[in-house]
Each structure stands twice: as structure tokens, then as C-alpha cells.
């Protein structure tokens, strides 16, 4: 049976999706494991001091918040769907992600269905997952390999990390 440290490292590796070096993944995994095993001690540390409010609002969400903070550069985060789309385009500068389709969809769900098909068709196949809680109005997710999505969701469920396969959930 794997321990939480191994599960966290696997999760970080899959979320990083080849965008981080192994030494960075190891360091991030250690930080997340520390927050996971003892959230209060993590919050009391210099690294976690600015997140003290989270102990009152969502103490179980501390490890998720730490993952978000540590991997911030690979997240897409904003409060407007067209800005989210621009961030997705930046993730794939060489891929054919067209400009935001203003007026093409009657609602947000239709946009995310269209985007999912587009990412699925971008080799080797990607998926935008919802991850964590922005504790505000922001959409917050990251693009992962579609082949890894089920394992990511399993790891998140096992570790009590808030995530879903769709921005609509």
C-alpha cells in the first residue's frame, strides 16, 4: 500500500504534466506532504503564514491550496471566460486554439463542451480540469494529459483534494 507521500508525489507529477523538473516536483511534494500531514504546523510556518485565514474557512482545503500555490504557473485562473480562453491559448502557443468564440455559444456550458472537444483533439489529448477552490469568483483549473485524468481524480479523491473532470461540476 502506498503512503500519502507517494500519492502526493504522483499527483504533483501528473498535474505538472512535464512542465517542471524532477527536483522541483520533489520539493513541491515535500511541501504539500507537510501541509497535508499537519496543516496547522504548516500554517504556523513562514511558508504558510499568509494562509492563516484558511484554518477558519476550510482547514481540509489547506493541502489543495498549497498545491495551487506551488503550481500556480501552470494554472489558468480568472473571473471571465474569455480571459480563461486566452490563458489556455498561452498554454498551447503552437496548437490551433482559435480566438475566443464571442457570440457562438448561448451559455458557458456550451463553451466548455466545445473547449473539451478541442483539447481532446490536441495531440496527445488534453483536458481542462477544475482544481481547488478560488474562495471567490474565479474559475480555477489546469490542463492535464487526458490519459492521466482518471488517475488524477482517483488520487484527489483518496487524498481529499477538491477537483473535478469538468469546469461545469
What residue spans do the PLM features occupy?
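A sequence-level detector of short, solvent-exposed, charge-rich linear segments
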Residues: 30, 103, 107, 161, ...
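N-terminal, charge-rich interaction modules
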Residues: 2-92
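Acidic, proline/glycine-rich low-complexity IDRs
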Residues: 113-169
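Residue-level signal for secondary-structure boundary elements
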Residues: 19-23, 37-40, 96-100, 127, ...
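Surface-exposed, low-hydrophobicity interaction/linker segments
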Residues: 66-131
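Short amphipathic alpha-helical segments
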Residues: 3, 107-111, 148
Amino acid at each position: 500500500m502506498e503512503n500519502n507521500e507517494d500519492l502526493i508525489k504522483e499527483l504533483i507529477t501528473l498535474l505538472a504534466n512535464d512542465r517542471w523538473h524532477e527536483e522541483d516536483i520533489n520539493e513541491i511534494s515535500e511541501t504539500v506532504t507537510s501541509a497535508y500531514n499537519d496543516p496547522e504546523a504548516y500554517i504556523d510556518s513562514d511558508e504558510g503564514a499568509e494562509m492563516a485565514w484558511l484554518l477558519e474557512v476550510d482547514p481540509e482545503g489547506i493541502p489543495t491550496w498549497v498545491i495551487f500555490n506551488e503550481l500556480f504557473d501552470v494554472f489558468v485562473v480568472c473571473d471571465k471566460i474569455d480571459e480563461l480562453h486566452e490563458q489556455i491559448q498561452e498554454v498551447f502557443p503552437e496548437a490551433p486554439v482559435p480566438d475566443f468564440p464571442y457570440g457562438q455559444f448561448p451559455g458557458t456550458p456550451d463553451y466548455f463542451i466545445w473547449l473539451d472537444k478541442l483539447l481532446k483533439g490536441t495531440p496527445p489529448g488534453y483536458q481542462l480540469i477544475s482544481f481547488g477552490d478560488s474562495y471567490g469568483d474565479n474559475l480555477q483549473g489546469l490542463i492535464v494529459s487526458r490519459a492521466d485524468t482518471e488517475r488524477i481524480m482517483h488520487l484527489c479523491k483518496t487524498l481529499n483534494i477538491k477537483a473535478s473532470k469538468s469546469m461545469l461540476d
